[in-house]
Amino acid sequence: MQYKNWVVIITGGGTGVGAAAALMLAKGGAKITINYSRSATEAETTAKACQELGGETLVCQGDVSNDDDCRRIVAETIEKWGRVDGLMNNAGTTQFVADNSLEALSADDFLRIYHVNVVGAYQMARAVAPSMQEQGKGSIVNTSSIAGVMGVGSSIAYAASKGAMNTMTISLARLLAPEIRVNAIAPGFITGRWWLDKLGQEGYDKMVSGVEKSVPLNHAGTPEDMAEAAVFLLTASRNITGEILISDAGMHLGGAPLIAR
């Protein structure tokens, strides 16, 4: 699939699924705004790799929980390339809670996670919608999680935020049609630094092995697996909107450990 001259904003685009999607789009000649909040080095590295693959890039720092930052990210993209064809809301945060006690999460924890995972995605959609509506077309893909479907994951606050993102995706799909399609991917376990940083190498290796043994497809999902789903919804699925596409090697079918991205 070619994405020649497609202009796409990817929040949280310097690492993980966002970086994998940026590289995939770059191979087809896309123009990509790579947003990051704190991972400046990783964002610059991803941008350089995209350029080597034939893509054009703009690296843009910004916190999606800040509405001014969201509007600036979109404005800088339009200033550079004149339009926005796609938005991938991939920026996200969580809080790992090992304790089963309800006291392990505070109201502030919930609000912090919601401000990034839900409000941030909404603010980016709101910022980009006028440009897409004016040109008569556009596509938004939200990176959700199987946590929002199954009520599992790193914490109740995280799972609840992804459930809210799923509902918001459907609401935005209704509101922004027919010009703009809005969909989401719901990854299961994803290999990479999120779990590695939390568990250490030994614990991470055990988790990957456990996932591979327990899910129906015997496969631990990679950032590239999720990027394929996201790029499909973003660019090729003109008849699909309001869809939550689960990509979890069958974890949601049951018999899987209670883990998620």
Residue locations for each model-derived region?
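C-terminal substrate-recognition "lid" of short-chain dehydrogenase/reductases
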Residues: Q2, Y122, H219-S247, H252
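Substrate-binding pocket helix/loop in short-chain dehydrogenase/reductase
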Residues: C70, A98-L102, S106-L111, I140, ...
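Active-site helix of classical SDR
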Residues: A125, S161, T169
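Residue(s) in the substrate-gating loop at a strand-loop-helix junction
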Residues: S145
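Alpha-helical segment proximal to the catalytic Tyr-Lys
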Residues: P130, A173-P178
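Short, small/polar-rich loop/turn modules that mediate ligand/substrate recognition or access, typified
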Residues: A177-R181, I240-G242
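Conserved glycine-rich cofactor-binding loop
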Residues: V7, G12-G16
